[in-house]
Swiss-Prot record:
Subcellular location: Fimbrium
Signal peptide feature range: 1-21
Highest classification ranks of the organism: Bacteria, Pseudomonadati, Pseudomonadota, Gammaproteobacteria, Enterobacterales
Pfam families, sorted: Fimbrial
UniProt xrefs under InterPro entries: Adhesion_dom_fimbrial, Adhesion_dom_fimbrial_sf, Adhesion_dom_sf, Bact_Fimbrial_Adh_Pro
Protein name according to UniProt: Protein PrsK
Gene source species: Escherichia coli
One BP term from GO: cell adhesion involved in single-species biofilm formation
Sorted UniProt keywords: Fimbrium, Signal
Amino acid sequence: MIKSTGALLLFAALSAGQAMASDVAFRGNLLDRPCHVSGDSLNKHVVFKTRASRDFWYPPGRSPTESFVIRLENCHATAVGKIVTLTFKGTEEALPGHLKVTGVNSGRLAIALLDTDGSSLLKPGASHNKGQGEKVTGNSLELPFGAYVVATPEALRTKSVVPGDYEATATFELTYR
């Protein structure tokens, strides 16, 4: 009985109402994503060990390198043989090729990214492996990077790095060719 009452009410509402037009929008996005970024590589956090601010008053004015890996997995068979390049993007510090930090040391500290060779500076906007990328040879691929904190030349000169939190954000983009 409840079902038929509901049906009657619906019918009454439809027959008593005026005709009304409404749009339905459909949207999508198709990707050629030969490999998936592993879950542990999405929204990655690289945490630098706590250091005294005075460590950034004298040359070389930098922290030890923290390593991190971007993992690609479930690479489709059509990806094998393709070259993948990874490019980090973010707000740059005045110190060329470094990421700008926020916090009390903005303009005094910067983040340097190291390329997959572990020693070459990877500038924001540049592709990894000196622009050459990596060949996808199987179902997965690991891209090892490093990062360190460095005092800007002005902060070294004036010994102006102070205690406090800092952070920087970079996004990465994968391109297949």
